[in-house]
């Protein structure tokens, strides 16, 4: 799966749940207070279901979730490692 498609799916999910004025793929989601820790849990569940991947404790870090770009890289890594329905 192309990283651009992954980014678009994540962006669509985020904007469905919360108004997205100025949201870009490189927006610092925690620093901008766009997401909170509770919202992050919803994102983890979305990523696992949407892309058919399993995220472990080591994957769930602020570094992996600080931007849409970072989340897309994590998803692509998991898909490439055979950790998803498209990998």
Labelled PLM ranges:
Residues 54-58:
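Beta-hairpin "wing" of winged helix-turn-helix
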Residues 8, 38-41:
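Short alpha-helical elements of helix-turn-helix
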Residues 1-22, 73-87:
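Thiotemplate assembly-line natural product biosynthesis machinery
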Residues 22, 53, 64:
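Flexible coil/turn residues that form the inter-helical turn or adjacent wing/linker of helix-turn-helix
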Residues 25-36, 59-67:
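Glycine-rich loop motifs involved in handling phospho/adenylate chemistry
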């Amino acid at each position: 799966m192309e990283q651009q498609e992954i980014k678009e799916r994540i962006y669509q999910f985020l904007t469905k749940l919360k108004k997205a004025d100025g949201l870009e793929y490189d927006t610092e989601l925690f620093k901008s207070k766009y997401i909170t820790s509770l919202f992050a849990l919803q994102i983890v569940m979305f990523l696992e279901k949407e892309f058919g991947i399993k995220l472990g404790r080591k994957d769930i870090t602020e570094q992996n979730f600080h931007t849409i770009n970072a989340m897309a890289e994590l998803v692509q890594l998991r898909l490439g490692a055979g950790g998803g329905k498209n990998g």
